[in-house]
Curated annotation (Swiss-Prot):
Key words, A-Z: Methylation, Ribonucleoprotein, Ribosomal protein, RNA-binding, rRNA-binding, tRNA-binding
Name this protein carries in UniProt: Small ribosomal subunit protein uS12
Top-rank taxon: Bacteria
CDD domains in the record: Ribosomal_S12
PROSITE patterns recorded: RIBOSOMAL_S12
Organism: Azotobacter vinelandii (strain DJ / ATCC BAA-1303)
Taxonomic placement: Bacteria, Pseudomonadati, Pseudomonadota, Gammaproteobacteria, Pseudomonadales
Function, as annotated: With S4 and S5 plays an important role in translational accuracy. Interacts with and stabilizes bases of the 16S rRNA that are involved in tRNA selection in the A site and with the mRNA backbone. Located at the interface of the 30S and 50S subunits, it traverses the body of the 30S subunit contacting proteins on the other side and probably holding the rRNA structure together. The combined cluster of proteins S8, S12 and S17 appears to hold together the shoulder and platform of the 30S subunit.
A Pfam match: Ribosom_S12_S23
This protein's encoding gene: rpsL
PANTHER family linked to this entry: 30S RIBOSOMAL PROTEIN S12 FAMILY MEMBER
GO-annotated cellular components: small ribosomal subunit
Length: 123
């Protein structure tokens, strides 16, 4: 425990909270252009081909973003919207693409949890 005299000479340091999504720069989403669309494999206990894309954002950052849902229409030069949210079993993937906005189509034949995948209500 510090004495009052010590605290007068040197006050306690404020802890600065570090952002989980620095490339967004305090914005809810960011627009960017796909520079590469590819699949990658997850960490140890899991096995799959996860769809990801490398995105050059409007603020100059280049980030890796996960493409959720079954099937997608993204290719190089597609314009996408990026939101925060990491993928636990893909190291270095800290962003998600927003389905159903800009060049990203919604998930086809999606019946439940549609709003997260940009799917319209079935007739």
């Amino acid at each position: 425990m510090a004495t009052i005299n010590q605290l007068v000479r040197q006050p306690r340091k404020r802890l600065v909270e570090k952002s989980d999504v620095p490339a967004l720069q305090n914005c809810p989403q960011r627009r960017g252009v796909c520079t590469r669309v590819y699949t990658t494999t997850p960490k140890k206990p899991n096995s799959a081909l996860r769809k990801v894309c490398r995105v050059r954002l409007t603020n100059g950052y280049e980030v890796t973003s996960y493409i959720g849902g079954e099937g997608h229409n993204l290719q190089e030069h597609s314009v996408v919207l990026i939101r925060g949210g990491r993928v636990k079993d893909l190291p270095g993937v800290r962003y998600h693409t927003v389905r159903g906005s800009l060049d990203t189509s919604g998930v086809k034949d999606r019946k439940q949890g549609r709003s997260k995948y940009g799917a319209k209500r079935p007739k």
